Amino acid sequence: MNIIEEIMTKLREDIRNIAIIAHVDHGKTTLVDELLKQSETLDARTELAERAMDSNDIEKERGITILAKNTAVAYNGTRINIMDTPGHADFGGEVERIMKMVDGVVLVVDAYEGTMPQTRFVLKKALEQDLVPIVVVNKIDKPSARPAEVVDEVLELFIELGADDDQLNFPVVYASAINGTSSLSDDPADQEATMAPIFDTIIDHIPAPVDNSDEPLQFQVSLLDYNDFVGRIGIGRVFRGTVKVGDQVTLSKLDGTTKNFRVTKLFGFFGLERREIQEAKAGDLIAVSGMEDIFVGETITPTDAVEALPILHIDEPTLQMTFLVNNSPFAGKEGKWVTSRKVEERLQAELQTDVSLRVDPTDSPDKWTVSGRGELHLSILIETMRREGYELQVSRPEVIVKEIDGVKCEPFERVQIDTPEEYQGSVIQSLSERKGEMLDMISTGNGQTRLVFLVPARGLIGYSTEFLSMTRGYGIMNHTFDQYLPLIPGEIGGRHRGALVSIDAGKATTYSIMSIEERGTIFVNPGTEVYEGMIIGENSRENDLTVNITKAKQMTNVRSATKDQTAVIKTPRILTLEESLEFLNDDEYMEVTPESIRLRKQILNKAEREKANKKKKSAE
């Protein structure tokens, strides 16, 4: 037997391990759903829900994938393990670890939008791991589809990211995941009602895992899960050897220590289910339970052959904010979990599975510094806690400054904007004011321009709302972390207008709103309960303005209360959680409960606020 034949005998041809990566909303999760439907995995009677791979309510509502999911499909006797990864760079910690578990990637790109910032981010991670790529140009049925140009853009991106010759020779499949069609031709007329071209391309091009099941076990934890019945679960790949239920094994910890434990349960992935199995071999993607304090990057080996794999690198947080117990006048009225103990327990529980998150104590037992990969990362955590019944307050997000080689540095983001040409001047000016550097400007046809900028992350805090207003809602902005660069001195970004602040507690009245709305934009409806120091709108000028929004019209013998019913006021602007976060200034908090999102001044009393401001100015 020659060397080539010997190597061939050591491959597990019955398995392929792939990750599906893409920009947000390019159809990745829909594609996975369709692969599940058309494979031999699901029972014919099984009805698959739309976005079946997205298990989290927020994921389904926003159409984004936050947590990596794993599933497996069977096709012509081959088991294809599929990792569905987040498409947003804020969840890049997940993306990096998944790349360690697979041998190839399916890159999904929109046939019209082409390559986007997050496409760049996830592809860079895949190429760094020397993974074999396949490109699926999705949404080929769009009237505006430009598949040939998009493939050229993908090739340019591969070259720019340093792909080797083998990676540059990627196969391309054209598909419409929502219609369940695909083809090797870029002509939409050639689409076939089958996913077979994608399945066949995966099996033909993605390498089979090496079968070294007879060697000592090596299993590395890439993801974490938690189950009330079995405790903490480590999900990862068996890189070498075999593991069975009941095996006595050693866990090599991140700090260099080791712990012995018994494998109590093993789980394999079948369709959308996680099923108990008795044994797993090299190349399998599995879940292991039995060790309560198992963590991402740690290695499981036999007790008599301890050999840890290199620790997985996890991107550091770039943004932080203060989480506080809710101490507003309305504290405890709407939430189930309101105490510092409950809030801290919930934050610590999040650390069990989210390794890109940091939670640090402060000098107060009611405050914590929470750091993450971006605004989206932290806003998802806040929204999740609010849905679970928690009350809390958070401060304005701020970037994390690092010292690199003795130089203070801050995070910069690569920003890509698609806007009608008529707004490009305003966009360029606004990002230049936020210390952005324009890298590229391309006319994409149909009166559209694509702008690419490098902008300090500080400059993007609160920019989204301004951008949408500037482009009348027609602009599309995507951004992703690029690198740390020397800190730019001075203030960047921030809110240009002051707040309208309630001076009294009570219910907002139509009468008061009518007199106040000429001063700015109102955030509350008539009848909304307010308190002193609560922000009820945005001033049209730079300064904060204290107003009485609870004042009722005095009744006279001539006029009656029914007269007010004909009063017409402007529709208030009700802020979303993200918009509220963007609105915040340094002296303000966002109050979050299961029922409400409120903005408030940190110091509620007007006289005390003015006193603190004078003290601050004299100190400067």
Residue ranges and their predicted role:
Residues 1-620:
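Structural and coupling elements of P-loop NTPases
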